């Protein structure tokens, strides 16, 4: 297994791309990762504005207060995701990492990697496994790019795809398969956002996962 720099990914906060004013609060929270959101929670009519506001944050030296900074783009299989990638390629100050949602094949990751390499962007990748096709191909996806730092398990969308309840037992196989693929590729693995804030002890009960993700800041 190759030696890697150890990066703490114990806690994770989403910050909406339309609200750059919330970014200082997020980075000052002490979290390990701040993810600026362009996908879920951003209405189609607001996608362009959210993209513009988010990428403008990286036009100057951005102080993340020690937090890892990630931008979750839209799926590269739709027009919004393609526009996100195009904007990242066009800027001379790309985000340090992007999160790829709803990945179905390793070719999607390879394509993004190749485009970033052509522009000599050093942007890292985080990949969400939340589709049945992605689950089937997860072992190949995990090894599709040296830019990948972590796999995320998207349990809510996965439950919808598998037509099962979003609960521990029905998703145990899917969650375990993602964990195994990540371990085999020497990647971190991060669980579905934890939503039951009244049961914090439940957040500890995670199977082979580096960390669960909390909700928005």
Predicted features along the sequence, with ranges:
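N- or domain-start disorder-to-order transition segments that initiate the globular core
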Residues: 2-25
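Hydrophobic faces of well-ordered beta-strands that scaffold small-molecule active sites
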Residues: 11-14, 34-36, 69-71, 98-100, ...
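Conserved, mostly hydrophobic/aromatic
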Residues: 26, 37, 98, 141, ...
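Glycine-enriched alpha-helix->loop->beta-strand junction motifs that scaffold or abut catalytic
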Residues: 30-32, 90-96, 145-150
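Active-site beta->alpha loop and helix N-cap motifs at the rims of alpha/beta catalytic domains
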Residues: 51-111, 134
């Amino acid at each position: 297994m190759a030696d890697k720099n150890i990066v703490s990914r114990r806690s994770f906060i989403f910050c909406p791309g339309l609200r750059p004013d919330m970014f200082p609060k997020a980075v000052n929270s002490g979290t390990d990762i701040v993810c600026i959101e362009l996908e879920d929670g951003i209405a189609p009519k607001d996608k362009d504005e959210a993209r513009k506001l988010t990428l403008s944050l990286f036009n100057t030296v951005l102080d993340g207060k020690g937090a890892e900074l990630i931008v979750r783009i839209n799926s590269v299989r739709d027009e919004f995701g393609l526009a996100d990638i195009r904007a990242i390629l066009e800027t001379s100050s790309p985000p340090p990492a992007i999160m790829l949602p709803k990945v179905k094949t390793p070719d999607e990751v390879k394509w993004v990697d190749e485009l970033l390499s052509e522009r000599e962007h050093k942007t890292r990748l985080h990949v969400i496994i939340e589709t049945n096709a992605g689950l089937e191909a997860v072992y190949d996806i995990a090894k599709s790019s040296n830019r990948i730092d972590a796999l995320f398990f998207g349990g809510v969308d996965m439950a919808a795809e598998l037509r099962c309840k979003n609960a521990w037992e029905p998703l145990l196989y899917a969650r375990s398969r993602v964990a195994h693929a990540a371990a085999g590729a020497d990647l971190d693995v991060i669980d579905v956002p934890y939503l039951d804030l009244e049961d914090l002890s439940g957040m500890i009960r995670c199977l082979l996962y580096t960390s669960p993700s909390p909700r928005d800041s």
